[in-house]
């Protein structure tokens, strides 16, 4: 889809608010008669032929910067007031009434702000109309001001208009919402949402669930509870979680669906945290290592990382890659992701269209002395020479070797070699970190031959390095691990799973040198990110995925021992990661991953694997390995036509006191609810003596896991 930069309208008005000039701003050479701006001109202002001006108001400007720009655009040297019929700009009333300098009232407090245009003008990416009046022509001339134009803004705009015809704005946008709000839905609101899902008949799966500290989980669509907290989950047709709520908070992934479901419910929502991540795919690749050659803080702010930019208000982050751009915003701003992508593509065309080779000496003061440094016993800094020794063997067009030395020639023709007075660091290699980040071939001196390294192959033989190469640096546990990274396990599990295993690290850092096998954390399992927010989400994931999951210091197993798979997952910041064994040879950069030793955790499973009947009645048998009806494992989904009731049961005082508040008033329509309410009834009927609870449980669940842990 090709992004069309919307036209903009600037209206200069006189004393009677009559339009003196109508400027139609566009980077194109024509009027788009189908645009909302032209419709507004023709239908509301009766202006058929405005002035076409090949300019563009940057939506990232502050109000003071905008006033300076508009004064320059209209060639006005007097104090001016800017306003709009649709949104408040530099002035607004305390009740957010639209400000008009010709119709001023002192009954309301007037506020002045210097915010960014895209924040104060809703929909500015698609429809921007700004009215400009000389302050002396209004009823409040004292509110006017004059601002000098920032020459950098004009310079940037001129360059933007020059490169615009060559920009490829064919883009495709994907979005992901992660919004969490504090709300007062409570049980009543959740039940209304369930009813609305059923009324809309949209075939979305909805589920109410309830769990306690003992992980007794109840699920279904109809509950009658006394002040008990519930969890609501709704999945769309692709089985993607659309929203999740416990009545007090709600996480929203599908904003439109949530809006439809609560249109008549007073949710009293208060944002806790929220963001939207847009992934914009580009038809034409860009240079991800962007560099701004003029002062452009009125658009983006550069960061220490070359491929990351921030918006001027630092609330929007932009991560650049060759073929796509990721934009993360705090609040929904219509089409801001497309507009920022347009600016990035333009800047790339202005300043970064050709990848320039970097001379090593230009980065010497930043990196050479820190990473490839000379110390008392190490001479790792290469030296520059002016010629090749006779008899040196040509390895490639930029690398020569003899028995005494190796020489690398960079793209600028500068020759580097390693001559260590101690005779140790004489092998030329390259710094991985800069090659991985920027494809820079920065030479450094090493103890051993580097020709087997992937970075060496790329710099010397121009062999493409695998894109998904994993960095040998191991992160501390706690951060989300990306595809090219790995991290340590939490201390308690690192000690347990890696007992008897070793990983040799380089001195003074966390770079893996060699290991014959060591458990670590890898990135998210599978192609899609799996986010588990509640205990109910965790239990459901484990039972469906049928693998072990580590959450904090707890281990979650599938309900049936025979279902336990060979994977180990671990939850970090609500995102599912994988535990794997890493292997690496000291002589190679290649890192291999293998399945974990899952049996170490499986042996802790607190339930015997030999099937033992617990109770049976009327052909229904509850065993330690599942629930059977007429000898057949019960694993079919129940239709919502079938409803089960948990009745009040006369039992011992201790059992009744514990279970009655939880299960006395429950009605449900789901398989899990049917099984668990039936099971609890059996437990209550058994009339277990409170003094014999532990021995009775150990009869059916003899392996608690404590013996293995101790």
Curated annotation (Swiss-Prot):
Compartments in which it is found: Virion
Name of the gene encoding the protein in the UniProt record: OPG133
GO molecular function, one term: DNA binding
Job of this protein: Acts with RNA polymerase to initiate transcription from early gene promoters. Is recruited by the RPO-associated protein of 94 kDa RAP94/OPG109 to form the early transcription complex, which also contains the core RNA polymerase. ETF heterodimer binds to early gene promoters.
Species whose genome carries this gene: Monkeypox virus
Protein name: Early transcription factor 82 kDa subunit
Lineage of producing organism: Viruses, Varidnaviria, Bamfordvirae, Nucleocytoviricota, Pokkesviricetes
Keyword Transcription carried by entry: yes
Record keywords: DNA-binding, Transcription, Transcription regulation, Virion
Record bears the keyword Transcription: yes
């Amino acid at each position: 889809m090709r992004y069309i930069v919307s036209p903009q309208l600037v209206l200069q008005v006189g004393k009677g608010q009559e339009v003196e000039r109508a400027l139609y701003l566009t980077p194109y050479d024509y009027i788009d008669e189908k645009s909302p701006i032209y419709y507004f001109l023709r239908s509301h202002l009766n202006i058929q032929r405005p002035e076409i001006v090949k300019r563009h108001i940057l939506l990232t400007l502050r109000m003071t910067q905008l006033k300076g720009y508009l004064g320059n655009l209209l060639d006005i040297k007097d104090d001016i007031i800017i306003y709009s019929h649709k949104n408040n700009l530099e002035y607004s009333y305390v009740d957010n009434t639209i400000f008009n300098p010709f119709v001023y009232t002192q009954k309301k407090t007037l506020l002045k702000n210097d915010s960014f245009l895209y924040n104060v003008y809703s929909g500015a990416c698609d429809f921007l109309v700004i009215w400009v009046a000389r302050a002396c022509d209004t009823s409040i001339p004292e509110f006017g001001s004059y601002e000098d134009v920032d020459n950098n803004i004009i310079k940037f705009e001129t360059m933007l208009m020059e490169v615009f015809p060559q920009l490829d704005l064919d883009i495709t946008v994907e979005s992901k919402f992660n919004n969490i709000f504090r709300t007062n839905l409570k049980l009543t609101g959740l039940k209304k949402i369930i009813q609305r899902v059923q009324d809309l008949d949209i075939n979305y799966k909805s589920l109410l669930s309830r769990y306690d500290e003992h992980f007794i989980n109840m699920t279904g669509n109809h509950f009658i509870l006394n002040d008990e907290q519930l969890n609501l989950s709704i999945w769309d047709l692709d089985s993607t979680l659309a929203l999740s709520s416990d009545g007090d908070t709600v996480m929203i992934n599908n904003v439109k669906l949530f809006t439809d479901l609560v249109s008549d419910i007073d949710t009293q929502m208060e944002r806790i945290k929220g963001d939207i991540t847009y992934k914009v795919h580009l038809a034409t690749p860009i240079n991800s290592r962007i560099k701004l050659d003029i002062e452009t803080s009125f658009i983006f702010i550069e960061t220490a990382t070359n491929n990351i930019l921030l918006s001027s208000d630092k609330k929007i982050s932009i991560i650049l890659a060759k073929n796509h751009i990721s934009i993360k915003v705090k609040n929904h701003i219509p089409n801001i992701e497309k507009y920022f992508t347009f600016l990035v593509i333009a800047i790339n065309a202005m300043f970064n269209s050709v990848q320039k080779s970097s001379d090593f000496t230009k980065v010497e003061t930043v990196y050479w002395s820190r990473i490839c440094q000379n110390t008392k016993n190490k001479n790792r800094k290469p030296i520059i020479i002016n010629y090749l020794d006779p008899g040196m063997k040509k390895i490639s067009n930029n690398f020569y070797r003899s028995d005494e030395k190796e020489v690398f020639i960079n793209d600028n023709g500068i020759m580097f070699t390693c001559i260590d007075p101690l005779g140790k660091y004489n092998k030329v290699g390259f710094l991985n970190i800069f090659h991985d980040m920027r494809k820079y071939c920065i030479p450094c001196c090493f103890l051993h031959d580097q020709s087997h390294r992937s970075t060496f192959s790329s710099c010397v033989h121009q062999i493409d390095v695998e894109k998904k190469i994993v960095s040998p640096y191991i992160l501390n546990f706690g951060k989300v691990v990306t595809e090219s990274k790995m991290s340590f396990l939490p201390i308690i599990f690192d000690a347990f799973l890696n007992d008897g295993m070793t990983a040799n690290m380089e001195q003074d850092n966390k770079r893996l040198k060699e290991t014959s096998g060591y458990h670590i954390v890898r990135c998210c399992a599978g192609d899609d990110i799996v986010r588990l927010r509640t205990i109910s989400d965790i239990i459901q994931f484990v039972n469906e995925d049928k693998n072990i999951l580590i959450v904090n210091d707890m281990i979650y197993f599938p309900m049936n021992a025979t279902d336990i798979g060979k994977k180990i997952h671990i939850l970090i910041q609500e995102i599912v990661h994988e535990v794997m064994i890493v292997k690496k040879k000291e002589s190679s950069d290649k890192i291999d991953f293998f399945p974990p030793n899952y049996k170490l955790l499986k042996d802790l499973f607190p339930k015997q694997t030999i099937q033992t009947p617990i109770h049976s009645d009327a052909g229904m048998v509850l065993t330690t390995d599942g629930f059977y009806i007429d000898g057949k494992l019960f694993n079919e989904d129940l239709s919502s036509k079938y409803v089960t009731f948990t009745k009040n049961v006369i039992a011992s005082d201790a059992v009744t006191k514990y279970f009655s508040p939880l299960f006395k008033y429950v009605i449900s329509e789901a398989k899990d609810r049917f099984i668990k309410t039936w099971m609890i009834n059996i437990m209550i009927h058994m009339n277990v003596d409170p003094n014999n609870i532990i021995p009775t449980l150990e009869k059916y669940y003899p392996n608690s896991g404590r013996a293995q842990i101790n």
